[in-house]
Amino acid sequence: MDYEALKDQWSDVEDRDGIRLSWNTFPSTRMEASRLVVPIAAVYTPLKEKPDSPLLQYEPVTCKAPCRAVLNPYANVDVRARIWICPFCLMRNPLPPHYKDITENAIPPELHPQSTTIEYQLARPAPAPPIFVYVVDTCQEEDSLKALKDTLILSLSLLPPNALVGLITYGTMAQVHELGYTECAKSYVFRGSKEYAAKQVQEMLGLLAAGPRPNMPQQPTRPPVGPAARFLLPVQQAEFQITNVLEQLQRDPWPVANDKRPLRCTGVALSVAVGLLETSFQNAGGRIMVFTSGPATEGPGHVVGPELKEPMRSHHDIDRDNIKYYKKAVKFYDALAKRAANNGHVVDIFAGCLDQVGLLEMKNLANFTGGHMLLTDSFTSSQFKQSFVRVFDKDANDNLLMGFNASLEVLTTKELKVTGLIGHAVSLNKKSSSVGETECGIGNTCAWKMCGIDPSSSYGVYFEIANQGGPAAVQPGPQRGMMQFLTYYQHASGHYHLRVTTVARPLSGPAGDPTLAQSFDQEAAAVLMARIAVYKADVDDGPDVIRWVDRMLIRLCSRFADYRKDDPTSFRLEKNFTLYPQFMFHLRRSQFLQVFNNSPDETAFYRHVLNHEDVGDALVMIQPTLDSYSLEHEGSQPVLLDSASIQPTHILLLDTFFHILIFHGETIAEWRKAGYQDQEGYENLKALLEQPKEDARELIADRFPLPRFIVCDAGGSQARFLLSKLNPSTTHTTGGYGGGVTSQTIFTDDVSLQTFMDHLMKYVIRKCFTNVMNEANPPI
């Protein structure tokens, strides 16, 4: 099968099962797996939308403990004996009584060959309706606060009618608003400079009285009983009260001197929000949505002092360990994040500020709980408003497209072991026969808690081969390795759902089996390696991570490229490997690994989003797409992400996922400024100027978070966003005859892709020669 046909096949599998694998044939021994360099791994999107898939309204049929695998199309079913054999543990299980009428031609949906992904609605109802607690920073300008209030009031109409809503505001003090008290505005005030233990918060709010016990089901349509009902009200009953409270919110009254920052107790407000939910709603779906317009400057978790002369920490400060508040703040927010994750609650962080707000310190609140992270210049921006509204997108049945209190478990056959997960989750510390010896990401477990999950939430799951090799390793007949992903989550409709995806792939034959190399998915592999690199970058030095990326690339090319000794020009890669070095070139230059010109908050935001998206979107972040428009061609033409693509008579459309940029070449910009497009006879120029705008609108239509939209001309200051992403094949040092500077010239010392590839070929051939010499003359 040729590469294009394989790509189509992998794309069909992704549409059906929401999964892409780095290798689509598994090596049969651990030794063979170690020589692959790129680990066996999957990018899995559990809730990928499948509108044509039925929702089964009965409990799944599971294997006996401890296996607990769910019945799937790969199970052997004996319809006469009414038994099925589990493909994971090979145990025989009786079919339940309601399967008595099945025959070879009439089988239940979960056994259909195309039902490798199936969803069940479980009988267990959710313990409470979805909960939304808005935590609002009042230390901001009037116009920003008004815009935020308007957006929050609008969001009330997007919530399910039975959803519970609470409100906490903070500035110098944190206030929990008692929405259930209608006589006048009433709130409980917490001092911003003091750290409160969980029990203190509960005592002060009067939450220790008998309330709904954890995991005790309530009617999903009924308001909660108990003390928390004073602070959390159903939208349908209290929309008027909640709207009134929001409308009456005022700026923090505490005076701020010109040389000071506002006193902002973000840590106390978050601590109170977590304490409020964990007392009465353990393991019930809830979101704490934080809206902050500046850094925390007092109390636990503060990231900078109130004096403006004291700057926010930079990457340089962190590298030199010149960070006064960083470690203590991280410890505080990480402890809060673990509490929220253990209770199944999501924390979303929405920042509306030109300066840093402390996202770096707070990042694990979102990373541990599956929350959203959004970085915008102001709450007045359309980027914030439209992105926030998209959080509440709904399906065809008017249910929110978000899952609550989610968990993921992975089962494997004896050939495979799970080594870990990289994504927005925490370990459930569940041990089983599927857990591997090594660790990659969040390891030593086969189950993780994600809390918040949506249709684009994706996770990198990594595996190892269990078989050590030897004569007994290769067994006669076709062999396969299997994995099953079990995603439990609270659906917005009020029931728990289970989505099951079962994947089977063939095992390779003896060493040197060509099907192994042919099964390599370079796009999935690039994204999975990028996740590992970003995971390493959070704990290691940047240059060390880039060296690791380079080493892995050299090893992969040494293993799979064709070349002759001492002849770099003979270097060749198969079609399904050719783009991989290019992806790695752009990854090592990207904002995920290069922190220069980005604040620590921006770096935390970019890495957060990369770890949330599937293969297609993550690849756009690593290697942006570039399209060209000109009068010679109709529509857009994909072009190389290279400085040579800049032409005076062309318009370029760059998509980096975070930015959508329209770039006008010099001549086009001059024509536009002269107004030719408005004159008769120049309709083709007008259409040319409009085409990239229409394509940009399509790109923006369903993207979260909403990208920043930039229109610029050659030589303009905003053109730097384009130039920073292009391969610098034409720089000030490689100019043509006379050394003249053109619009294609990029002033940089970065190496070009061609130089990178030349060095790669030399290293690969040298490494191969060195390995051969070492084998011939082993070191003593």
Swiss-Prot record:
CDD domains linked: Sec23-like, Sec23_C
Function: Component of the coat protein complex II (COPII) which promotes the formation of transport vesicles from the endoplasmic reticulum (ER). The coat has two main functions, the physical deformation of the endoplasmic reticulum membrane into vesicles and the selection of cargo molecules.
Bilayer disposition of the protein: Peripheral membrane protein
Family: Belongs to the SEC23/SEC24 family. SEC23 subfamily.
Organism: Aspergillus fumigatus (strain ATCC MYA-4609 / CBS 101355 / FGSC A1100 / Af293)
Subcellular locations according to the entry: Cytoplasm; Cytoplasmic vesicle, COPII-coated vesicle membrane; Endoplasmic reticulum membrane; Golgi apparatus membrane
One Pfam family per UniProt: Sec23_trunk
InterPro entries in alphabetical order: ADF-H/Gelsolin-like_dom_sf, Gelsolin-like_dom, Gelsolin-like_dom_sf, Sec23, Sec23/24_helical_dom, Sec23/24_helical_dom_sf, Sec23/24_trunk_dom, Sec23_24_beta_S
GO biological process: COPII-coated vesicle cargo loading; intracellular protein transport
GO molecular function, one term: GTPase activator activity
Encoding gene (name): sec23
GO cellular component, one term: COPII vesicle coat
Name listed for the protein in its UniProt record: Protein transport protein sec23
